Swiss-Prot record:
Keyword Secreted recorded: no
Gene3D superfamilies listed in its UniProt record: 1.10.1500.10, DD-peptidase/beta-lactamase superfamily
Annotated S-S bridges: none
Gene: glsA
Species this chain originates from: Oceanobacillus iheyensis (strain DSM 14371 / CIP 107618 / JCM 11309 / KCTC 3954 / HTE831)
Residues the entry annotates as binding substrate: S77, N129, E173, N180, Y204, Y256, V274
GO MF term list: glutaminase activity
Name the UniProt record assigns to this protein: Glutaminase
An annotated GO BP: glutamine catabolic process
């Protein structure tokens, strides 16, 4: 058995995988001091900057958990993947893509510069703030709770429970997010919002404030890896085409303005949030039979110390190492 290769059909192999991940979580946890926790949302700055945890759930039932896996944190921008999926299920993929494009921006996630200088002026993709706010306006319902109910129901089917809103995070975002309000007014002026602005922003702030764990993120990733079908029940929860577009967006746009580097060096669809979470999707692949998770897996990471792009600094390093050692890249 060579490093990075293991036969998962044996208990020894599973123990090796667990020991391997434990060792590298401990190694990268020592590098969390290179980043800083988010402070522009006041509630987030209370997170432990030294925390680091990972959960990997395979289609074959293998589960690897290491580090700070029991900590809850707000999902933040990772929820943009889910709101996009639900909007497409309700309104149709083609309609949603008339309102929001699928192009990377190369700009900060809360920038509006591309809206001002490009024609047409629609948001570049649903994973930046302008796109996610537009998508929130497209969700069916007259109130924020009505708009979010299908998203809650989808998560309940995926996870087996309904995540709760962290009220302190929600209030913190609602009361301090002047940039998102400015983006909202700009989108309203350009005619991209289909709901009242206050309801749209309330919806957006609420779905960004849902509490999750790394296990929750890994399970969401596993369903996406399986093209929207829950591997435990074989129930199709997300239409295949929508799941595939969502994964494509994660690969090209999911890591803010570091998406190109992440795609090049890690090579799997992923979406990060400023709370320190990362949702990653490993599709099935046909390669060396000794490699782990050939059937696909979902990965959830939490490390609130962020780099300059707003991504978990230790989480990205951990994912890059595991992806390289286990040949997880799509390419």
């Amino acid at each position: 058995m060579v490093q990075g290769s293991v036969n998962l059909n044996t208990e020894r192999g599973k123990e090796w995988l667990q020991d391997y991940v434990d060792n590298w979580v401990n190694f990268y946890q020592k590098q969390t001091d290179e980043g800083k926790v988010a402070s522009y949302i006041p509630r987030l700055e209370h997170a432990d900057p030294n925390a680091l945890g990972i959960s990997i759930i395979g289609k074959n039932g293998t589960v690897i958990r290491s580090g700070d896996t029991d900590l809850e944190f707000s999902i933040q921008s990772i929820s943009k993947v889910l709101s996009f999926i639900v909007a497409c299920m309700e309104r149709g993929l083609s309609y949603v893509l008339q309102r929001v494009d699928v192009e990377p921006t190369g700009e900060s996630f809360n920038s509006i510069m591309h809206l001002e200088i490009n024609q047409p002026k629609k948001p570049f993709n649903p994973l930046v703030n302008s796109g996610a706010i537009t998508v929130s306006s497209l969700l069916n319902g007259r109130t924020s709770d009505q708009k979010l109910e299908p998203l809650y129901q989808l998560l309940e089917k995926i996870l087996g429970h309904r995540p709760e809103i962290d009220v302190e995070v929600y209030v913190s975002e609602r009361d301090t997010s002047m940039r998102n309000r400015a983006i909202g007014y700009y989108l309203l002026e350009e005619g991209y919002l289909e709901s009242d602005l206050s309801i749209t922003l309330e919806t957006y702030f609420k779905h960004c404030s849902l509490n999750v764990t790394v296990d929750d993120l890994a399970m969401i990733g596993l369903v996406l890896s399986n093209d929207g079908v829950h591997p435990n029940t074989d129930e199709p929860l997300i239409p295949k085409q929508i799941a595939r577009v969502a994964k494509s967006l994660m690969l090209t746009c999911g890591m803010y303005d570091a998406s190109g580097k992440f795609a090049s060096y890690v090579g799997i669809p992923a979406k990060s949030g400023v709370s320190g979470g990362i949702l990653a999707v490993v599709p099935p692949r046909v390669r060396d039979q000794n490699l782990p998770f050939l059937e696909g897996c979902g990965i959830g990471v939490f490390g609130p110390a962020l780099d300059k792009q707003g991504n978990s600094i230790a989480g990205i390093k951990l994912l890059r190492h595991i992806a390289n050692q286990w040949d997880l890249s799509l390419f």
